[in-house]
C-alpha cells in the first residue's frame, strides 16, 4: 500500500539516486531544501547500494524516488522491489547513456 502524504502538514520529501562507479552513498550525498520540498541526492556505486539507499529513503519518509539515467530497466525494477512498491520509483531513461560509453547501467551494474 502506498504511503499517504499530506503536503500541508509536512514538507514533501523525495530522493534522487544516481549511480556511478566509485560513489560512496555514505559520503556522496546532499540534501536540498526549499520551502515545500526536501530532496535527498545520493550517489551509489552499483544497484546493490542503491537498493539499500532506497530502503533508507523509504524509512526517511520520502514520497517518491527518482533514478538517474544510469539505471536501466533492470535497475529500476530492483529499486521498485527494494521499496516493496510502497512509494513510486521513476527514472530518467536512456537506452544507452553517453557517460557510460553508450551502455545501459544494466550492462555495467
Predicted regions and their residues:
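Hydrophobic faces of well-ordered beta-strands that scaffold small-molecule active sites
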Residues: 14-16, 40-42, 67, 89-91
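Long, charge-rich, low-complexity intrinsically disordered regions
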Residues: 23, 29-32, 42, 102
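Amphipathic, hydrophobic secondary-structure cores in small proteins
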Residues: 47-73
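Short, well-ordered coil/turn segments that N-cap beta-strands
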Residues: 10-12, 61-63, 85-87
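Active-site mouth loops of central-metabolism enzymes
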Residues: 35-47, 109
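Short, charged, surface-exposed secondary-structure boundary motifs
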Residues: 97-103
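Alpha-helix-loop-beta-strand connector modules within alpha/beta enzyme cores
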Residues: 73-96
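N-terminal basic/disordered segments at the start of proteins
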Residues: 2-23
Amino acid at each position: 500500500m502506498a504511503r499517504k502524504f499530506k503536503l500541508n502538514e509536512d514538507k514533501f520529501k523525495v530522493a534522487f539516486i544516481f549511480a556511478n562507479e566509485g560513489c560512496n552513498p555514505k559520503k556522496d550525498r546532499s540534501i536540498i531544501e526549499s520551502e515545500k520540498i526536501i530532496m535527498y541526492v545520493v550517489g551509489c556505486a552499483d544497484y546493490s547500494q542503491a537498493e539499500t539507499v532506497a530502503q533508507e529513503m523509504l524509512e526517511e519518509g520520502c514520497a517518491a524516488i527518482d533514478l538517474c539515467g544510469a539505471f536501466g530497466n533492470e535497475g529500476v525494477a530492483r529499486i521498485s522491489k527494494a521499496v516493496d512498491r510502497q512509494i513510486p520509483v521513476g527514472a530518467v531513461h536512456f537506452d544507452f547513456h553517453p557517460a557510460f560509453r553508450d551502455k545501459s547501467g544494466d550492462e555495467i551494474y
